[in-house]
């Protein structure tokens, strides 16, 4: 498991600019080995336009900061349910400090693009020596397209960059972000539009249009399909996706059966149960 960075543990950037682009990040993990070539640092951007029934990062779905209550070890005392007057707690409706086991935190930290780039580039020599890099993930990073553009521009030519995306974004945003990436991982979950809407909340028209662009873009890429039992792993769906990806690289990812454990922590229900 990768090491999670907290913003508080890092000194602010010495660079000062008039216009700063902020992004909302719910996790940063180093020593990630499943998010691209080599050993990487993965930045998980908060917010997603889809709501996949099997999502393994429910804390990344909302575009806003939210409480994260760790379930393992909870005493059920109810103290955290009482609103408080701390400035940092008012908008969340619960107290961050009252839990006797310190299980309450906030999912979502704002980062300024230059500050985050400086943080990530502290490992530049290691990445360039070992063949790793930086991966933007989510949530859906393209939901914060302008922040991605600014961050990737700061990283460009200094370290290998990749993105993991559902492809659900305006093509204008999709193009301007992936053109700054050295590698693109894009999901194609379900080929049938109605099935896609049933299990993700949206149809796949935009996704397929962006996939077609990616196929002919010349940008190194791999399509991915999570194998969800009796939903995406059917022979009919996989055959249809195989036709869609054509000659492109295509990975089938195993189902993460532990995904449901995090849902209660952000007050959501796991739909696959």
Indicate where each model-derived feature is located:
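Short glycine/proline- and charge-enriched loop/turn segments
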Residues: 264-272
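N-terminal cysteine/histidine-rich coordination modules
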Residues: 22-47, 53, 58
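Glycine/small-residue-rich loop that forms an oxyanion/phosphate-binding "nest" at active or ligand-binding sites
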Residues: 72-82, 93-130, 134-135
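Iron-sulfur (Fe-S) cluster-binding segments and ferredoxin-like electron-carrier domains
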Residues: 57-67, 105-108
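Conserved AdoMet/S-adenosylmethionine-binding subsite of the radical SAM
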Residues: 114-117, 121-265
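Cysteine-centered iron-sulfur cluster-binding motifs in ferredoxin-type domains/subunits
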Residues: 42-55, 68-102, 140
């Amino acid at each position: 498991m990768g090491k999670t960075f907290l913003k508080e543990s890092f000194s602010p950037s010495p660079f000062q600019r008039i216009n700063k682009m902020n992004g909302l990040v719910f996790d940063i993990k180093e020593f990630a080995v499943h998010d691209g070539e080599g050993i990487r640092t993965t930045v998980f951007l908060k917010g997603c336009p889809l709501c996949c029934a099997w999502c393994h990062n429910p804390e990344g779905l909302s575009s806003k900061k939210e409480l994260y209550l760790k379930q393992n070890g909870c005493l059920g005392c109810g103290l955290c349910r009482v609103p408080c007057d701390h400035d940092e707690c008012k908008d969340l409706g619960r107290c961050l400090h009252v839990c006797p086991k310190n299980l309450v935190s906030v999912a979502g930290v704002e980062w300024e693009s230059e500050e985050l780039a400086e943080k990530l580039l502290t490992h530049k020599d290691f990445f360039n020596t070992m063949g790793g890099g930086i991966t933007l993930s989510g949530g859906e990073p393209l939901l914060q397209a302008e922040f991605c553009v600014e961050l990737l521009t700061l990283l460009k030519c200094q370290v290998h960059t990749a993105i993991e995306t559902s492809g659900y974004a305006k093509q204008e945003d999709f193009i301007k972000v992936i053109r700054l990436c050295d590698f693109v991982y894009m999901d194609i979950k379900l080929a049938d539009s109605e099935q896609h809407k049933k299990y993700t909340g949206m149809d796949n028209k935009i996704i397929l249009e962006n996939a077609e662009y990616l196929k002919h873009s010349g940008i190194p890429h791999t399509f991915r399909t999570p194998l969800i039992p009796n939903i995406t792993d059917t022979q009919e769906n996989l055959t249809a996706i195989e036709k869609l990806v054509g000659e492109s690289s295509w990975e089938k990812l195993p189902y993460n059966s532990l995904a449901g454990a995090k849902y209660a922590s952000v007050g959501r229900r796991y739909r696959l149960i």
